[in-house]
């Protein structure tokens, strides 16, 4: 075995209970998941919130890893302490150092099995290109969104989120578990291939690049005055064009997409994710792009995993 | 207008946010809902829990209306006080008395639009027979379940629950809102017909009579060891027979329905409702029955609404 360790995180949000359940089953039965001969650390991100069945205690753990906050002496939220704890235990310079972090989430949106990367770190892009090449799943590239920062995986040299949905919060679902299991297996297999220099990279990576968040239309007291339109509800990853209905009020007032030219396509993701309403996000708009897989991505990942 | 008042309750569970949103829209625009010339009182069942986005504060409000508890001097849960408050304000002998209570819920189960009645109170059976005759929706008759008691509507002389799903908790959904709106309209229309002696009762009422709750298979520490089988997930109201798979473990172990003869049909409801896991209910089993509409049902409802 190489000295590389992979950190697998579940329950970063305490009401996303499928991955934590899967990890628990795995603990009881080693053979459930093929580790592809990789050293693994598994951890529950927010065990207190999981116990209480809620997303978080004081604040969203997956927005609590901002470096300036972690270095501050003025922490008070439970999730800031938990973030520090996770980094000092499993961070690249921690007691039990891991080089890659994979954070398993679920969503009420119809995201299927998908990956999320933050920014354009070369090693992230390299590893997700391998997983996409294997499973064909879509990748949401989250960047340039100052209101949303401090994601867990950003505290590791390489890392990404697995999002599986749709599933309500607090509900175990056989299909969601199986999708999570399949994606986890592919992640470990591809990491193992990199460690063993058996990779075949694709020529291109398909990303859905974050453009902007779209909020519900709201009345003067902040309550949504329109709801996600039925022609877009559940249609994550389906391209839409200028003029497509986004929201509809009970009186039939439509809010349309007013973006781009007549033929330009945009791809909405995280449509009506329950947890994002408090963040004023009814959906996010992305642009589908094909990127050539770059040598420096491959080199960065290779250097990290074959030091 | 007659002196009859109908109490419409939303947000009895604080994370079922669709009906509360609909009531809020209604407040802003009177014409949204046709009251069919009935006196209406609307109220948010559990406003504190709604504000906090959770099902309840201390205990399930919709299990907090047990008469012995409400008469006890030893109350301590927030929901017991709220139950007392609702009854003393809107109860049949309250400051602002209502004769019928309709309690609007949503569920993560695929219940469609459906009604729930508790026990076999004649006036309840009469009114739901009229609504079923109008909309064709299924009715779950909950009875003989000692572990589940103290439902809100039982504190009124007549009352029932409207359940609409599937929808995750904490998520506004256009279709769920529209289903709620349509059912609400039918409820008010039929009550108005009774008040105005314009009813045409059907000959029969179709009920799905509660037989038993079925829990997840659990390991020694109480964690579910199997999940709802994919052939039954989302299949509320579809009949199943002896031998039908109910649960499946990750190792492929099946738990089958072992009930009744080879040809006997049972109908599962509230399959994988997120909030029921803590109540050890993975689904409830019912029996579909056709009951003749009885004269005493009609008389009881008529006496209540035309005193």
Curated annotation (Swiss-Prot), chains A, B:
EC number: 3.5.1.15
Chemical reaction(s) catalysed: an N-acyl-L-aspartate + H2O = a carboxylate + L-aspartate
Binding locations of Zn(2+): 13, 16, 105
Cofactor needs: Zn(2+)
KW RNA-binding (keyword) present: no
Binding locations of substrate: 55, 62-63, 163, 276
One example GO MF annotation: hydrolase activity, acting on ester bonds
Family as reported in the entry's similarity comment: Belongs to the AspA/AstE family. Aspartoacylase subfamily.
Protein's UniProt name: Probable aspartoacylase
Taxonomic lineage: Bacteria, Bacillati, Cyanobacteriota, Cyanophyceae, Synechococcales
């Amino acid at each position: 075995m190489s000295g590389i360790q992979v950190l697998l995180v579940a329950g970063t949000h305490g009401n996303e209970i499928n991955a934590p359940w899967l990890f628990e089953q795995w603990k009881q039965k080693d053979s459930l998941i093929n580790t592809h001969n990789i050293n693994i650390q598994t951890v529950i991100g927010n065990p207190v919130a999981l116990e209480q069945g809620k997303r978080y205690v004081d604040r969203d753990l997956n927005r609590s890893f901002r470096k300036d906050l972690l270095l501050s002496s003025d922490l008070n939220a439970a999730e800031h302490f938990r973030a520090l704890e996770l980094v000092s235990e499993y961070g690249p310079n921690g007691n039990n150092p891991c080089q890659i972090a994979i954070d398993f989430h679920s969503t009420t949106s119809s995201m299927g099995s998908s990956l999320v990367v933050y920014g354009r770190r070369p090693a992230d892009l390299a590893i997700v290109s391998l997983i996409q090449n294997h499973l064909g799943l879509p990748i949401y590239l989250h960047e340039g969104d100052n209101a949303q920062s401090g994601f867990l995986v950003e505290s590791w040299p390489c890392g990404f989120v697995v999002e599986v949905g749709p599933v309500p919060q607090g509900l175990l679902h056989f299909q969601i578990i199986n999708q999570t299991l399949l994606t986890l297996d592919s992640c470990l297999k591809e990491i193992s291939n990199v460690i063993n220099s058996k990779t075949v990279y694709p020529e291109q990576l398909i990303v859905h690049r974050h453009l902007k968040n779209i909020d519900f239309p709201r009345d003067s007291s902040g309550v949504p005055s329109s709801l996600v339109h039925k022609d877009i509800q559940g249609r994550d990853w389906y391209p839409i064009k200028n003029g497509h209905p986004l929201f509809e009020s009970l009186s039939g007032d439509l809010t349309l997409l007013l973006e781009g030219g007549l033929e330009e396509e945009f791809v909405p993701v995280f449509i009506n994710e329950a947890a994002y309403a408090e963040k004023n996000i009814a959906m996010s708009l992305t642009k589908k792009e094909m990127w050539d897989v770059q040598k420096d991505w491959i080199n960065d990942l290779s250097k990290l995993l074959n030091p």
